[in-house]
Structure formats: C-alpha cells, structure tokens
Amino acid sequence: MRVVILGSGVVGVTSAWYLSQAGHDVTVIDRESGPAQGTSAANAGQISPGYAAPWAAPGVPLKAIKWMFQRHAPLAVRLDGTPFQLKWMWQMLRNCDTRHYMENKGRMVRLAEYSRDCLKTLRAETGIKYEGRQGGTLQLFRTARQYENATRDIAVLEDAGVPYQLLESSRLAEVEPALAEVAHKLTGGLRLPNDETGDCQLFTQRLAHMAEQAGVTFRFNTPVEKLLYENEQIYGVKCADEIIKADAYVMAFGSYSTAMLKGIVDIPVYPLKGYSLTIPIVEPDGAPVSTILDETYKIAITRFDKRIRVGGMAEIVGFNTDLQQPRRETLEMVVRDLFPRGGRIEQATFWTGLRPMTPDGTPVVGRTRFKNLWLNTGHGTLGWTMACGSGQLLSDILSGRTPAIPYDDLSIARYRSDFAPSRQQRLHSAHN
C-alpha cells in the first residue's frame, strides 16, 4: 500500500519506519529542510512512561490562578478570544477531576510503557545511537504535600506494573550523587528506574536515514497546501503545482494538524509552548546522571553525553514562538539551584517549541471517519516518550494486524461529540 505521512518529527519518522517495515511504500512530506526541525529539535530529552500524566489534573485550575502572580510559574495563559482556544480550555477544565485524571493517566502510561518496549526492540535490532541512557527518572519534591500527593500517582503505577522507589531526601544522592549538596532543600523524590533519556533530534535524524535506506521517500522543503477529498475519502495532497497521491494518508503535523484538517476532521490539538536550554557540561560529577523532574516548577533536567538539557513550562498563547527572557531566567534558576556546578549556563542555547496537546493529554492515534485518513498527533509533552509505540500501533492498525495493546480509547472518536464538523461544513469545504 502507498502511504503518505505528513510530518517528519519524531512521530512522523517512527510512523514511516514501522509502516515501511510492514511492507508499505512510504513517502514523508515536510516543509522543513530535514527531519526533527520543529518540536522534536530540542525537547527535554526524557523517555518517561511512568511520568506520563495529563496537565489536566485535580487542583490545576486553582494553581493556575496562583501561577498568574508568580514569576517562575510553570503555566501561563494568554486568551486570544478564538472559539477554538476557549473550547479547548473548557475541555481541559472538564478533565481536571480525579476520575478523568486517573483514566487519562492510565491510558497514557499504557501507551508510553508499550512505546518504551518498542524503542528497546528497535535499539536492539538496529543498533541506533542517540546519546541514550537507561538510568531512570527522579521526580523531586520541595514540600511535604508534594511528597504525600505522590501516592495518587503510585496507585496508577502499581496498576500498570511499573516499578518505583519513593525516596526520602536523605536517599536522593544514592541515585543522583550531585544532589548531595542540595538535599536539604528537598523533601524526597519518586524514582522510576526503568525510564530512559536521549537526544530526540539525533534519534529522529538517524532513524530517518535508516528509513530512507529501507526505501522510504522523504520530500523535504515541500509545504503542504491542503488535502483533497471527495465522498469522505482523501485522493491527494496538494503541494504547490503538484498533487501527491497515495492509498492512505497519515497526519503527523503536530500542532499544525488541526489547521490542515479544518473542514475535514476537527481535532482538539492545541499548541502548548515550551522552552529549553542546552548547556555544555563543565564538571561531569556536578551534572545529573539521568533525568530530574522538578515537581514545583515542572522542569526536567536531562543528561546527554556532554550537555545538559533543561526543559519545561507551558504557555497557552497560540502559535507564538517568541523567546521570552523571563522563561530563560526560570530555567537558569532551577538548574543553578539543583546543579550549581553542572554546566556553563552563559553558553547555553535557548529554544522554544510548540507541543501538540489534547485537552485530556492523550494523543489521537487511529483512523478517522475518512476511510483512508489516519491520525498520529496530539502527544503534547510526551512525543519522544510515546513515538515508537504510536508508530508501531498505527502501523498495526493500518495494516490490519491486531495491536499489542488496547487502542480504542486513543482514537478521535472520544471527542466526536465536541469536535465534529457538520455535514454542511464538510460539503462546503469540499467545493472550495
């Protein structure tokens, strides 16, 4: 089967790899000059299935109000008055109760755990190198309440069979020696020993090269104008004066998926702006061994070979990609506070990207009402964590094979009543 994939980020490239391995003739289209030039370029670098959790959580609405008045707040909102933003935020608020949180986190952990298994298999079969480490993740708590609240997440971890260690502050240095100097500032931590880290951009670029050698065609510097469709079936992708045809089409454009599908399939994927710093390491002993998650500021600090990646925060500001100096100051403050000897902050590279987020935090993976249009988008802050599993899952569904995990609750059907274009809308769009 001929398959066109729209998007060459980590999700698009893993989809291409697994579909190619299943015997399909795959073409990837992207406006960028190469793979992983957008959100996959400089994310936090963590592969953390156990910490897969929605931003929509109990207490977040009240916290969001408090964060409005804090300099180093992890979340910022700028209302633009658009119906889509308001509808998306309302949907997110509706998911901020305990029942929805547990349900959403459960399916996110399911997909993320499966994805880690897929990555492990891929690594063993191909030998792909991406500055990966298998040293686990350590979530740090600064207050007694944070430490106590960890029991809520532990219940989900136990249900999913995810191993963990709940550590008091005196034991943090056992897994992250550099924290010995700052343990007095912390109340404890939750460690997931099976989690991993790695450079997402490097992985994506090298996997794209392997996919190309396996027969995948990459069409870079090729902006997509629109999808062409009739009778609820896609019949081509319009790119300037060219129409690229296939038997099946996969939307993996991240935050830009929503606009590209307007009038065809409405999906609740909104750009959640995040930031990162990439810092050269000065003293290896003063840097983290693996990944640290600061629960207070929602910031991750990840060790690569000779660099530290500090990433986090969320801004609901539309497609704005301006680099905000106060956000850099927050990232610098956290890494200086926890790893004062870790790296040369003055030489850091500052970056921002747009994560494609759904209101419930779970991606949308699977077929749409269109017979040959498939989705693999909406992974939010967990695109790197979920990419391999999502790609393998999509390949299995599209190929008619039985997937290794349940997947019905990952499809767009769960949003159909709230995000669905009318028949009149679709007919109008089809004739424009």
Curated annotation (Swiss-Prot):
* Top-level taxon in the UniProt lineage: Bacteria
Q: In which pathway does it act?
A: Amino-acid degradation; D-alanine degradation; NH(3) and pyruvate from D-alanine: step 1/1
Q: Name one GO cellular component term.
A: plasma membrane
Q: What keywords tag this UniProt record?
A: FAD, Flavoprotein, Oxidoreductase
Q: Tell me the Gene Ontology biological-process terms attached to this UniProt entry.
A: D-alanine catabolic process
What cofactors are annotated for this protein? FAD
User: Top-level EC class, please?
Assistant: oxidoreductase
Single Gene Ontology MF annotation: D-amino-acid dehydrogenase activity
What this protein catalyses is:
a D-alpha-amino acid + A + H2O = a 2-oxocarboxylate + AH2 + NH4(+)
> Which gene is the coding source of this polypeptide chain?
dadA
EC number(s) of the enzyme? 1.4.99.-
Function noted in UniProt: Oxidative deamination of D-amino acids.
Q: Which Gene3D superfamilies match?
A: D-Amino Acid Oxidase, subunit A, domain 2 (3.30.9.10), FAD/NAD(P)-binding domain (3.50.50.60)
Residues involved in FAD binding: 3-17
Name of one Pfam family that matches: DAO
Q: This chain belongs to which protein, by name? A: D-amino acid dehydrogenase
Q: Does the keyword Magnesium apply?
A: no
The family this protein is said to belong to: Belongs to the DadA oxidoreductase family.
